[in-house]
C-alpha cells in the first residue's frame, strides 16, 4: 500500500503543477488496503479537501491503482481519523489563553484554536520596530489625503488601551437589537446585503465559494491567508463580505474590518503625518478578521507594504484570519515586496473566472427576480450569450433593459433587449475578433500567426491552435464552421473537438486555467 502511494504521488507530482500537488495530493495518506475486496482507502485531512480530491482526482488515482496491481481497485476517500480525534478534543478542551505562534512555525491544532476562541482576551504581540521614512519618500507616497482622522473605527477605551482581543463564541444569531447591529456594521465596514445566500455559484467560482465557506466556519485555521484573484466584477468583494457577515452571525463580538487597499494606504499616510502609528498598529493588530480588497494598489508603496507586513505577521501569529483579493495572481503583481508575496503564497490562492453561460443566465434571472421582474429565459440567454466578461456588466445591462422597458411602456422581449443594449452589443461585437485572438495566442506561446492556419501538428503548435479555437468560441459570436474557416479551412468538428478538449482540461489543470485567464484578460483589455 505504501509502495503504491509513493509511486502514485511521484507520478502525480510530475503531472500536476507544484501548487496543485502541495494543496491537494501531499496532504493525503493511504490508511487501509483490502486485497480480498480490492479496495484502497485514502484519508484527507478535512472535509473540504476530501470532497475536492474525490471530484477532481479520484479517476486518475483509480487508474494508477489499477495499473499498479493489474486489477481494478475501488479507491475510497475517507476523513482522516485523526481529524475526528482533534475535533472531539476541541469540544472537550477547557478555555485557555492564546499562545501566539511564531511566523512559519507549525500550525496549531484544532483543539488549541477552539480553546483560544473561548478566551475573553489576550495581549496582542508587540509590533516590530518601525523604520523611519525620509521626507522625500513620504512625499512620494502622499495620496493627497484630506485632514480627516485616520479611518480606524473606535474601540472601547479599556480595549484600546490594552490592545485586547474580544473574539468570543456567540449564539449563532444576529445582535439582539438594531442599534447594536448598526454599530457592528459601521465598525466593520461590511455590506450586510452581500451574503453566501445571494451569491450565484457556478464552475467559475465554486472552488472560491467552497474555500470561503470553509474559512468562515474555521477562521484562522483552514487557510490563512485566503487569497482570491480575478478580473473586475467577478464576485471577489461579494465573497469576502459574505465571510465577514457569516462570522458576525456566528461569533458575537468578533472584531472584523473590511477595507479597500487604497483606504489602507491613505490610513498609513495619515498615521505618518500625525505620528499616530501606535494607534494604527494597535487597531489593525488586534483584529480577528481583516478583509483587504484589491491589494494590487499597494504596488510601489514601500511604507504601506512594510506596515501591512507587520500587521499580517501579528494577525497570523494570533490566529486571526486574513483574506486578500487582487486582480491578478500574487506573483504577477508588480511592485510588491517578495516577503509579502511569499506570505500570500503560504495560504490558499484561488482564482475566480468569468462566469460560464449557465451561470450568467442564473445571475440575470436572480437579479431580475430581486427587482420583482419576471425575466424570460429566452431574454436571459440572449443577454448572457452576448455579454461574457463579468457580473457587474450583466447587472448593468439588466438595469438598462428594465429602464428601457419602463420608459417605453413595453414588455421585455428579445427585440426590446436588442434596442436597449444596441450600443453595448455593438461595442462587444467589435471588441474581440478571431484574428486578434490568433495574434494574441501566437505571441503568448511564441509561435507564428501563420501556424494558426497551417496543417502542422507538432504539440508546440497544435496546442496553442486549440486554445485559440476555444477562445474564439468563448469570446466571439462566430459559429463553429466560421471559426474553422478562419483557422485554415478546418472542419467544424475539428473546432468542436478543440473546444471540448480545452474546456475539459481547464477544469482539471490549474496551469492551463491560469494561462487562459491571462489571455482572456489581455483580449478584454
Swiss-Prot record:
<dbReference type="InterPro" id="IPR027417">
    <property type="entry name" value="P-loop_NTPase"/>
</dbReference>
<feature type="region of interest" description="Domain IV, binds dsDNA">
    <location>
        <begin position="406"/>
        <end position="525"/>
    </location>
</feature>
<dbReference type="GO" id="GO:0008289">
    <property type="term" value="F:lipid binding"/>
</dbReference>
<dbReference type="InterPro" id="IPR013317">
    <property type="entry name" value="DnaA_dom"/>
</dbReference>
<feature type="binding site">
    <location>
        <position position="237"/>
    </location>
    <ligand>
        <name>ATP</name>
    </ligand>
</feature>
<dbReference type="GO" id="GO:0016887">
    <property type="term" value="F:ATP hydrolysis activity"/>
</dbReference>
<dbReference type="Pfam" id="PF00308">
    <property type="entry name" value="Bac_DnaA"/>
</dbReference>
<feature type="region of interest" description="Disordered">
    <location>
        <begin position="162"/>
        <end position="182"/>
    </location>
</feature>
<dbReference type="GO" id="GO:0003688">
    <property type="term" value="F:DNA replication origin binding"/>
</dbReference>
<protein>
    <recommendedName>
        <fullName>Chromosomal replication initiator protein DnaA</fullName>
    </recommendedName>
</protein>
<dbReference type="Pfam" id="PF11638">
    <property type="entry name" value="DnaA_N"/>
</dbReference>
<keyword id="KW-0235">DNA replication</keyword>
<dbReference type="Pfam" id="PF08299">
    <property type="entry name" value="Bac_DnaA_C"/>
</dbReference>
<feature type="compositionally biased region" description="Low complexity">
    <location>
        <begin position="169"/>
        <end position="181"/>
    </location>
</feature>
<dbReference type="GO" id="GO:0006270">
    <property type="term" value="P:DNA replication initiation"/>
</dbReference>
<dbReference type="InterPro" id="IPR020591">
    <property type="entry name" value="Chromosome_initiator_DnaA-like"/>
</dbReference>
<feature type="binding site">
    <location>
        <position position="236"/>
    </location>
    <ligand>
        <name>ATP</name>
    </ligand>
</feature>
<keyword id="KW-0238">DNA-binding</keyword>
<keyword id="KW-0067">ATP-binding</keyword>
<dbReference type="GO" id="GO:0005737">
    <property type="term" value="C:cytoplasm"/>
</dbReference>
<dbReference type="GO" id="GO:0005886">
    <property type="term" value="C:plasma membrane"/>
</dbReference>
<dbReference type="InterPro" id="IPR001957">
    <property type="entry name" value="Chromosome_initiator_DnaA"/>
</dbReference>
<dbReference type="InterPro" id="IPR038454">
    <property type="entry name" value="DnaA_N_sf"/>
</dbReference>
<feature type="binding site">
    <location>
        <position position="235"/>
    </location>
    <ligand>
        <name>ATP</name>
    </ligand>
</feature>
<dbReference type="GO" id="GO:0006275">
    <property type="term" value="P:regulation of DNA replication"/>
</dbReference>
<feature type="region of interest" description="Domain III, AAA+ region">
    <location>
        <begin position="189"/>
        <end position="405"/>
    </location>
</feature>
<comment type="function">
    <text>Plays an essential role in the initiation and regulation of chromosomal replication. ATP-DnaA binds to the origin of replication (oriC) to initiate formation of the DNA replication initiation complex once per cell cycle. Binds the DnaA box (a 9 base pair repeat at the origin) and separates the double-stranded (ds)DNA. Forms a right-handed helical filament on oriC DNA; dsDNA binds to the exterior of the filament while single-stranded (ss)DNA is stabiized in the filament's interior.</text>
</comment>
<keyword id="KW-0963">Cytoplasm</keyword>
<dbReference type="InterPro" id="IPR010921">
    <property type="entry name" value="Trp_repressor/repl_initiator"/>
</dbReference>
<keyword id="KW-0446">Lipid-binding</keyword>
<keyword id="KW-0547">Nucleotide-binding</keyword>
<dbReference type="InterPro" id="IPR013159">
    <property type="entry name" value="DnaA_C"/>
</dbReference>
<dbReference type="InterPro" id="IPR003593">
    <property type="entry name" value="AAA+_ATPase"/>
</dbReference>
<feature type="region of interest" description="Domain II">
    <location>
        <begin position="71"/>
        <end position="188"/>
    </location>
</feature>
<feature type="region of interest" description="Domain I, interacts with DnaA modulators">
    <location>
        <begin position="1"/>
        <end position="71"/>
    </location>
</feature>
<dbReference type="InterPro" id="IPR024633">
    <property type="entry name" value="DnaA_N_dom"/>
</dbReference>
<feature type="binding site">
    <location>
        <position position="233"/>
    </location>
    <ligand>
        <name>ATP</name>
    </ligand>
</feature>
<dbReference type="GO" id="GO:0005524">
    <property type="term" value="F:ATP binding"/>
</dbReference>
<dbReference type="InterPro" id="IPR018312">
    <property type="entry name" value="Chromosome_initiator_DnaA_CS"/>
</dbReference>
<comment type="similarity">
    <text>Belongs to the DnaA family.</text>
</comment>
<comment type="subunit">
    <text>Oligomerizes as a right-handed, spiral filament on DNA at oriC.</text>
</comment>
Amino acid at each position: 500500500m505504501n509502495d503504491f502511494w509513493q509511486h502514485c504521488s511521484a507520478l502525480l507530482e510530475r503531472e500536476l503543477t507544484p501548487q496543485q500537488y502541495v494543496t491537494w495530493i501531499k496532504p493525503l495518506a493511504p490508511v487501509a488496503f483490502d486485497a480480498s475486496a480490492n479496495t484502497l482507502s485514502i484519508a484527507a485531512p478535512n472535509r473540504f479537501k476530501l470532497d475536492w480530491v474525490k471530484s477532481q482526482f479520484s479517476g486518475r488515482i483509480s487508474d494508477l491503482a489499477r495499473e499498479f496491481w493489474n486489477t481494478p481497485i475501488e479507491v475510497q476517500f475517507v476523513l482522516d481519523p485523526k481529524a475526528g480525534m482533534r475535533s472531539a478534543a476541541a469540544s472537550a478542551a477547557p478555555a485557555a489563553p492564546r499562545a501566539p505562534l511564531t511566523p512559519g512555525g507549525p500550525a496549531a491544532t484544532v483543539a488549541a484554536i477552539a480553546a483560544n476562541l473561548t478566551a475573553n482576551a489576550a495581549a496582542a504581540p508587540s509590533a516590530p520596530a518601525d523604520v523611519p521614512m525620509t521626507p522625500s519618500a513620504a512625499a512620494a507616497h502622499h495620496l493627497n489625503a484630506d485632514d480627516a482622522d485616520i479611518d480606524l473605527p473606535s474601540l472601547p477605551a479599556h480595549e484600546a488601551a490594552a490592545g485586547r482581543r474580544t473574539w468570543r463564541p456567540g449564539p449563532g444569531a444576529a445582535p439582539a437589537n438594531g442599534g447594536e447591529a448598526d454599530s457592528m456594521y459601521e465598525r466593520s465596514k461590511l455590506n450586510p446585503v452581500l451574503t453566501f445566500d445571494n451569491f450565484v455559484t457556478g464552475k467559475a467560482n465554486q472552488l472560491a465559494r467552497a474555500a470561503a465557506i470553509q474559512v468562515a466556519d474555521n477562521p484562522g485555521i483552514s487557510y490563512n491567508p485566503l487569497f482570491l484573484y480575478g478580473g473586475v466584477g467577478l464576485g471577489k468583494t461579494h465573497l469576502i463580505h459574505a465571510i465577514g457577515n457569516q462570522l458576525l452571525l456566528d461569533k458575537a463580538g468578533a472584531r472584523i474590518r473590511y477595507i479597500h487597499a487604497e483606504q489602507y494606504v491613505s490610513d498609513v499616510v495619515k498615521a505618518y503625518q500625525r505620528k499616530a502609528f501606535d494607534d494604527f498598529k494597535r487597531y489593525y493588530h488586534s483584529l480577528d478578521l481583516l478583509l483587504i480588497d484589491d491589494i494590487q494598489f499597494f504596488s510601489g508603496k514601500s511604507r504601506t507594504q512594510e506596515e501591512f507586513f507587520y500587521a499580517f505577521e501579528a494577525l497570523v501569529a494570533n490566529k486571526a484570519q486574513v483574506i486578500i483579493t487582487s486582480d491578478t495572481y500574487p506573483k504577477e503583481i508588480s511592485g510588491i515586496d517578495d516577503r509579502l508575496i511569499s506570505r500570500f503564497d503560504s495560504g490558499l490562492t484561488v482564482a475566480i473566472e468569468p462566469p460560464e453561460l449557465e451561470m450568467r443566465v442564473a445571475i440575470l434571472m436572480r437579479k431580475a427576480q430581486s427587482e420583482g421582474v419576471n425575466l424570460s429565459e429566452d431574454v436571459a440567454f440572449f443577454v448572457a450569450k452576448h455579454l461574457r466578461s463579468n457580473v457587474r456588466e450583466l447587472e448593468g445591462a439588466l438595469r438598462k433593459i428594465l429602464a428601457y422597458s419602463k420608459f417605453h411602456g413595453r414588455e421585455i422581449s428579445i427585440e426590446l433587449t436588442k434596442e436597449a443594449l444596441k450600443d453595448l452589443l455593438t461595442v462587444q461585437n467589435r471588441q474581440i475578433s478571431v484574428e486578434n485572438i490568433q495574434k494574441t495566442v501566437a505571441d503568448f506561446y511564441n509561435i507564428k500567426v501563420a501556424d494558426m492556419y497551417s496543417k502542422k501538428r507538432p504539440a508546440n503548435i497544435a496546442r496553442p491552435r486549440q486554445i485559440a479555437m476555444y477562445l474564439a468560441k468563448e469570446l466571439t459570436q462566430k459559429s463553429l464552421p466560421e471559426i474553422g474557416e478562419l483557422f485554415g479551412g478546418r472542419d467544424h468538428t475539428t473546432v468542436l473537438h478543440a473546444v471540448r478538449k480545452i474546456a475539459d482540461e481547464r477544469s482539471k489543470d490549474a496551469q492551463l486555467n491560469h494561462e487562459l485567464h491571462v489571455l482572456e484578460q489581455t483580449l478584454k483589455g
